[in-house]
Amino acid sequence: MVTSPFARWQREIAEEVNEPFTPDQAPLFRAVLLHQETHCIFILSSHHAVCDGSSRIFLLRDILLALSGHALEALPLAPSRENLFGAQQRTSTEPGLPSFAAQRPLLPRVEGVKLTPQQTMALQGRAREEGVTIHAAISAALTIAGRAIDENWRNSPLRIMSPAEIRNILGLKDQCMVSVVGGEIFIASGGSMTFWELARFAKDGLSAVKSRENISRKIDLHCTAVSSNLTVEQAFQLKRNVFNAQVMFTNLGRLPFDSTFGPLKLETLWAPCALRGIEGEQTLGAVTVNGSLHLTHTSPAPIPGLLAGIEEELRKACAI
């Protein structure tokens, strides 16, 4: 618990993101409370083997329900994504390393901005008119802003890793588990697409991510990698090949429950904040709370002005 009224949530989140979990020491979960007289901040972090970003949002809901006097029942252990999808689940046939010394990365920088409810509504309306998702619109803003600032982004193909929620496909509601599948938007260097043309391109690039064929293929690839008893070097190369996108962008969508819990109210939510251990990586998180779109940027080597640039591109595209 941190009781200092001057504690900054950005610094605390950065330290949590930078603190590794020991895989064989449960629980693979941590919680931090920044407490003040009339406000408090919960920071929930976990190993990705335990749950995903949506799960942590539901856990935060349960914490607020408990604090407001609701009795909560214990839930059964959720089956794995593989079991729910009916896919063959394979594991390694050799024990893992007893320890592995990895160099600690630089402390990341975390920052956030939020649009007003009016600006968020304008963005939603314009995206609907253009036939694209909010995720696609933010991806376009991210691309334009990043390439305006960073020469490497301008002169190289841009890969945007975009994890997609598949709870509805798996028949899930608020279970605490991993229920995402990987997607990626690939944008060649150069080009002269307008903002909304770029947004439509991004939407098309993710159109098949939630198909049963793609989910099955992704699960099979993951299981094959795990069951092949990779060496440390092989695992490192696999991570570089699969997760080496310049940016990971996760949109958790609209808060799936009311933000008022008796005398308590959830005012803001900055999520998700995660790192992959890739050189130069940028992570963008998005979630809409109380009608306001919240954007969070996390990186050990942040592109200066990226988040402000994204906000500005969204404003220009929607005339807000």
Name each model feature, range by range.
Residues 25-43, 103-167, 291-294:
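Gly/Ser/Thr-rich phosphate-binding loops and adjoining beta-strand/alpha-helix segments
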